[in-house]
């Protein structure tokens, strides 16, 4: 039977998975989809719009974060933190600044995790980076999130080594509805959200509009944020088969960053919220890490849903620009941040006096230090066309193509001379408003095509597919107009999976049992930043593809009110290449170092389980035990960027070293309770009243500090500093009540780090691989927030 797209609108305003209690991150194999048909929607139906895979039948390891769970965590300062509590996922703030966050899955960093928005890749093609601060509006605009660990469900995401995260934004509901909410933290960080859905309009139109405004400070010193976020979703239904979906999302923002790691001694002296990135300039707080950015993002999707043939076509464009304050020092000068007063903050008065005192023959002040605005931006555009044809009742053929265009630019502009008349930088004078250093960018053309077959019966779900990738990369000098030659590469991936239902749930039997396995191989193209790493127009020597091999197997069981999944995985990462500039100056040849031959092996076991203890109480638990280690001693080469001549060669000793930046042991649990109560405000309006509570516990252990492989040039170099394990407890309470006909009120309060644990969140290894030389960021102390929502139907 053909689906009407307005059913999708209804689905997108209904919980994905609900089995009592507050919203959950359901473990794979949950049977709760069949528990309450009137309040659920299958993931298969949602995937019509955004490639959500069905937890019930897929041979992949999936976790879906539902709208209820997102509502509980909307006060989190960083979007990725809503993904905590999933085994193998380490999602935290990077430095404590609002919006600055990092995501690791199964030991792989952000550039090896695919991020998709409504089924469309949104990462940069230069390095695979994902700057979450550019997407601050996502926390309010998101309807649901699916985390696909391992190779992922998408055939077009070639960077999914650790996994894939697919984010679904809100669309119009079936009927007119609105929401107003406001929340604030103990530091005064306040967010206001307005959301309105038109419901189904005449002639097949529907729209949803959301606006949010966030301002205030976090627990870190001088961490102001000011951002206005928006989402607009418009759909048009053409009959029962065709639908157009337009989405616009953006978040112009300004926020102060803490981007200088701290030592243990500094944290003990000044506290974990200490930042040495600011001081008083002309009597006002001045941050040297202020960031400003705006990336408006637009998509247009065409959906055809037929009995035998269905397709999804998308076009998208993003035009990003912004910048961030940074420091610059003359050749003989020390750094700005080294000028500290008695409180540990930047002494701008001393810096200005030093700048003014240094005179040339004409009496002009020659600055030793200055502030610049590091400006950057890009144009990102692309198109995806995919379709599937049902050959028989059991066999389906899928195929598609994708094109991505990514063009970047960057330049540095003199922002503040700090009392001087000009800055003498490598022999050239620079005055206020001048551009300093190189101005360049990279252009990327990335294409891919895939074909996949699926075989589905009552017992079996099999799929196998292959994808071919092509990348073309060129660098351009925006000062001279010169361009480099094109660097070209090809890649290919093959992946498949199988799931077998040993026991299927029936109307008379709730129990279900299945086993699954998946595997894949990816000859992966390096990012453009590897091919074009230098500040000149040279192409990096001897670039070769990475070779990634992944495999996983597991078992799922489900019963009335509960479920469990256990899986084991292995990921072999071969021929990882790192290319980094040693110098980036406009007037001299840069040197680069390239490290090749790095191998690593990631393996682990994961468990998730949940159980409804009563009608009002639900518990879930998870655990992960992993081993991620290097398996090779790579080769480092330093060479001249222009001539390509080798300057020196050296060995890089990473064999048997633990991978850093994420815990290799995780475990935790969560209790969720919902208590129906009588109406407290008005008689006859309390039928939907309830009080809910959620308490979570997350433990992280066996975590090593991050480190650069280039620092391991001695065979005696050992593991990075092992961070202390830590336990975090969070709690949320809330009250839902009907305050008037069609008006629901929700009052909530959240406390994170309930017992005020003192812990290290992330950091960089030091020379001695110990706490004394370690530099990093300590996690936030106990923090609370309160809020109020009004929903109108």
Give the positions of each predicted feature.
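Conserved C-terminal beta-signal and adjacent last beta-strands/turns
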Residues: 6, 249-251, 499, 513, ...
């Amino acid at each position: 039977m053909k689906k009407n797209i307005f059913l999708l609108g209804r689905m997108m305003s209904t919980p994905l998975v609900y089995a009592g209690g507050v919203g959950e991150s359901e473990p794979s194999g949950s049977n709760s989809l069949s528990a309450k048909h009137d309040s659920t929607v299958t993931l298969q139906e949602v995937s019509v719009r955004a490639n959500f895979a069905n937890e019930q039948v897929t041979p992949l390891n999936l976790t879906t974060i539902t709208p209820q769970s997102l509502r509980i965590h909307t006060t989190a300062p960083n979007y990725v933190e809503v993904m905590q509590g999933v085994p193998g996922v380490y999602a935290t703030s990077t430095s404590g600044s609002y919006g600055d966050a990092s995501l690791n899955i199964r030991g792989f960093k952000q550039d090896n995790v695919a991020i998709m928005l409504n089924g469309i890749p949104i990462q940069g093609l230069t390095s695979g980076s994902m700057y979450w601060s550019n997407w601050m509006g996502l926390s309010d605009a998101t309807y649901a999130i699916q985390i696909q660990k391992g190779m992922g469900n998408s055939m077009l995401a070639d960077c999914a080594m650790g996994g894939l995260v697919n984010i679904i934004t809100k669309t119009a509901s079936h009927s007119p509805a609105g929401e107003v909410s406001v929340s604030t933290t103990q530091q005064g960080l306040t967010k206001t959200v307005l959301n309105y859905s038109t419901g189904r309009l005449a002639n097949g139109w529907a729209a949803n509009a959301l606006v949010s405004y966030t301002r205030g400070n976090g627990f870190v010193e001088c961490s102001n944020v000011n951002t206005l976020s928006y989402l607009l979703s418009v759909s048009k239904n053409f009959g029962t088969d065709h639908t157009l979906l337009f989405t616009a999302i953006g978040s112009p923002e300004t926020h102060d960053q803490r981007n200088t790691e701290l030592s243990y001694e500094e944290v003990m002296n000044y506290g974990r919220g200490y930042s040495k990135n600011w001081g008083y300039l002309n009597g006002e707080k001045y941050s040297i890490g202020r960031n400003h950015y705006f990336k408006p993002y637009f998509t247009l999707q065409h959906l055809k849903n037929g009995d035998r043939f269905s397709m999804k076509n998308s076009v998208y464009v993003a035009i990003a620009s912004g910048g961030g304050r940074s420091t610059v020092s003359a050749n003989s000068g020390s750094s700005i941040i080294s000028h500290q007063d008695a409180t540990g903050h930047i002494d701008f008065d001393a810096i200005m006096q030093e700048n003014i005192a240094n005179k040339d023959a004409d009496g002009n002040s020659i600055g030793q230090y200055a502030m610049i605005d590091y400006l950057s931006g890009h144009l990102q555009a692309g198109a995806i066309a995919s379709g599937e044809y049902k050959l028989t009742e059991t066999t389906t053929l899928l195929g598609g193509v994708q094109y991505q265009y990514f063009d970047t630019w960057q330049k540095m502009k003199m922002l503040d001379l700090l009392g001087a008349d000009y800055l003498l930088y490598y022999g050239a004078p620079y005055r206020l408003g001048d551009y300093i250093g190189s101005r360049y960018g990279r252009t990327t053309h990335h294409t891919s095509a895939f074909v996949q077959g699926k075989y589905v019966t009552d017992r079996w779900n099999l799929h196998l597919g292959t994808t071919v990738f092509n990348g073309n990369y060129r660098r351009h000098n925006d000062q001279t107009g010169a361009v480099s030659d094109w660097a070209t590469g090809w890649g290919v991936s093959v992946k498949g999976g199988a799931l077998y239902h040993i026991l299927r749930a029936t109307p008379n039997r709730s129990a279900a049992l299945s086993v699954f396995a998946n595997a894949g191989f990816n000859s992966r193209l390096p990012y453009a930043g590897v091919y074009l790493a230098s500040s000149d127009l040279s192409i990096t020597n001897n670039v070769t593809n990475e070779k990634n091999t992944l495999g996983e197997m597991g078992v799922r069981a489900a019963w009335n009110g509960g479920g469990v999944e256990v899986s084991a995985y292995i990921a072999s990462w071969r021929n990882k290449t790192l290319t980094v500039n040693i110098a980036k100056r406009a007037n001299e040849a840069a040197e680069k170092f390239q490290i090749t031959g790095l191998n690593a092996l990631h393996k682990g076991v994961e468990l998730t389980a949940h159980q409804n203890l009563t009608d009002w109480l639900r518990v879930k638990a998870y655990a992960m035990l992993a081993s991620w280690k290097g398996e090779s001693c790579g080769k480092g080469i330093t060479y001249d960027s222009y001539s390509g001549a080798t300057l020196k060669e050296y060995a890089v000793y990473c064999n048997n070293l633990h991978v850093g930046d994420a815990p290799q042991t995780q475990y935790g649990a969560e209790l969720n309770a919902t208590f129906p109560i009588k109406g407290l405000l008005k008689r006859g309006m309390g039928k939907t009243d309830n009080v809910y509570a959620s308490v979570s516990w997350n433990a992280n252990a066996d975590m090593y500090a991050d480190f650069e492989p280039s620092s391991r040039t001695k065979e005696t170099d050992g593991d990075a500093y092992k961070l202390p394990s830590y336990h975090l407890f969070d709690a949320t309470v809330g009250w839902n009540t009907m305050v008037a006909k069609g008006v629901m009120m929700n009052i909530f309060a959240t406390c994170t780090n309930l017992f005020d644990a003192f812990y290290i969140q992330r950091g960089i290894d030091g020379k001695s691989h110990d706490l004394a030389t370690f530099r990093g960021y300590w996690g936030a102390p106990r923090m609370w927030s309160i809020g109020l929502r009004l929903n109108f139907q």
